[in-house]
Structure formats: C-alpha cells, structure tokens
Amino acid sequence: MRVAVDGMGGDHSPSAVVKGCVQALEEFKDIEIYITGPEDILKEAFSKFKYDKERVTFIDAKEVISTNEHPAMAVKKKKDSSLVKALRLVKDNQCEAVISAGSTGAFLTGCTLIVGRIKGVERPALAPVMPGKNGPFMIIDAGANVDSKPSYLVQFAKMGEVYFKSVMDVNNPKVGLVNIGEEEEKGNDLTKATYKLLKEERDINFIGNVEPREVSTGDVDVLVCDGFVGNTVLKMYEGVASTILSMIKSEVKSSFLAKLGVPFLAPALMNLKKKMDYKEYGGAPFLGVKGICVKAHGSSDAKAFKNAIRQARKFHENDLIGKLSEEITKKSFDNQKNI
C-alpha cells in the first residue's frame, strides 16, 4: 500500500511526521511512504533514522499552506504546496491514501476539489472515532459542513454505518441523532426533518435522538449531526477528557496518602489515559471522497502519525472506499426507483 504524507503539515512538522513515518515503516512491512515537502529538509530529517530507503519516495514541494490562509484560495493558488502535491498523488492513483495534520479547512477543501467526491455523495463528512465508556463511537459530521440539510445528515448516517460494518466489524451499528432531547418533536427544523427521514430508512438501525450527556457512553455507534454541532461536541469532549486527567494527576500529588496509593492505581490510570489519548486513534477519516483521506490532529506527535498510517492501512485492507461507493450507488438507484 502506498501512503501520501504531507510532510509539512502540523505543529511539529517535519520532525514528528518523519519519525512517525519511520515507526510505521518498521511496524508495517507492506507500506510505502510518499512524503511531500522541501526535499532537502525532509531528507535531512530522515537522515537521523535508520529506515528502508527503497520504501520512501520524496516529492519536492516548495510551498506550505498555513492555518491562517483561506482554504479554497490556498488550495487553488499553492499548487506546489506539500498538501496539494500529496492530494495529487491520490488523485493520480499513485497512492491509495493521504494523511495530513495541516490546515483542516485546506485539507477538506483539497480532498473535495482534487481527490473528488464519490458519485452520489452530496457532501463528504469528517468522521472521528472516539473512545466511549462501552466502546468507540463516531461523530459525523465533525466540522466539514457547518450548514447542512436533512438529506446530508441521512447520508452521513449511511456512511457511518458502512464504516462500522466494514472497519469495526459491527453487524448492525446503532445510529443516533444528536439533539437537545430524546423526544421526536424536540430540536430545530433540521433535526426534526432529519429524524423523520432516518425513521423511514429501513436499512439504517436508527435508535432516535441522543442527548449530549449520552454521547460518551458508547451505547450508540454512529452519532449524526451537522458540522457545527459535531465540532463543538468533539472539542468539548477532548477538553473534558484532558481536564479530568489533569485533575486526577493533581489529586494524586495532593497528599502523602494519595501518593501511597499510586502503585496500586497506576495500571488502571495508565489504561484510562491510553483510552482517552487521541494519539491512539491517529486521525479522522474524511468520508465521501474517492480516496482514503485521514486528517491527523494539528498537534500530532510521531505516535499519532504512525497510528494515522495504521488507520489508513486498515481502511485499505477493508476496502472502505469500495464499500462506501457501492452503498451510495445502491441508495441513489433505490431513490430513483421510488420517484
């Protein structure tokens, strides 16, 4: 499998990106890395490690898209940027996947404009998988579409369902609609209309509305919402998780007795920290485009990049894009028959 990596994306590029690539090459013997960015800088970063040189290709790119640039304008103007060149590798079928920790807006825009949407997809969606009390869950959309229509959200539900079936091996994923109350009549015009449509979908296991306080239980596999709500839920969830871990650390240091208990609690605390660590999940897939596109966290370190590559590899092994295309095409055909 060939993976395109934006070598200059993220807060800690290129060092963290390169180190993550080296770790991935060591762990996964069936991958090749195509890394984009200033060739001299990238080669210098790689020279600090031992790696299989036959499995790394450097794609020279002189420009970098920053987070404060207008996404669409930057993608269209900076054709020699590390991000655009990485996306082009997927567009031209030179790579099966692309990973970037750079500007989220530019990445999502570039995926849509360059890689292109799967036929029948109205809007691609950002779909991070998060740790929950009883298992992982997906938030879709987590920021790609701030303004949405009911038909978009129904398609998000279908894409999330396909993901859980093919990647997570869940036979009948439970789909919920994020709302301010469980009752059908609760919410705004968007959620009310979406509820009715999802209720009519016979091939989606729709369980109804899900209140934000129930999001983290993991009892629902796919949480559907517009990008504004999804991004808010995602960032609040990350913030609360970080705060809880910090509070536990402070309490442990607060007294002598608490410190005495650390050896007994350490395994459980380490396990909790691992479950809540975004680095373990690598990145969020951008579902609905023709290639495997993974958005890594902006502050990703080497471990996060390695896991983003692991994630992309798993998507490829499970033919996620092929299954999404098949389901969307089937759904579009069924809709035409019913017109």
From Swiss-Prot:
GO biological process: fatty acid biosynthetic process; phospholipid biosynthetic process
Keyword Lipid biosynthesis tagged: yes
InterPro entries: FA_synthesis, Phospholipid_synth_PlsX-like
UniProt-listed Pfam families: FA_synthesis (PF02504)
Record-listed E.C. numbers: 2.3.1.274
GO cellular component, one term: cytoplasm
Keyword annotations of the record: Cytoplasm, Lipid biosynthesis, Lipid metabolism, Phospholipid biosynthesis, Phospholipid metabolism, Transferase
Catalytic activity field: a fatty acyl-[ACP] + phosphate = an acyl phosphate + holo-[ACP]
Pathway assigned to this chain's UniProt record: Lipid metabolism; phospholipid metabolism
Family, per entry: Belongs to the PlsX family.
Complex and partners: Homodimer. Probably interacts with PlsY.
Functional description taken from the UniProt entry: Catalyzes the reversible formation of acyl-phosphate (acyl-PO(4)) from acyl-[acyl-carrier-protein] (acyl-ACP). This enzyme utilizes acyl-ACP as fatty acyl donor, but not acyl-CoA.
Protein name: Putative phosphate acyltransferase
Species of origin: Clostridium perfringens (strain 13 / Type A)
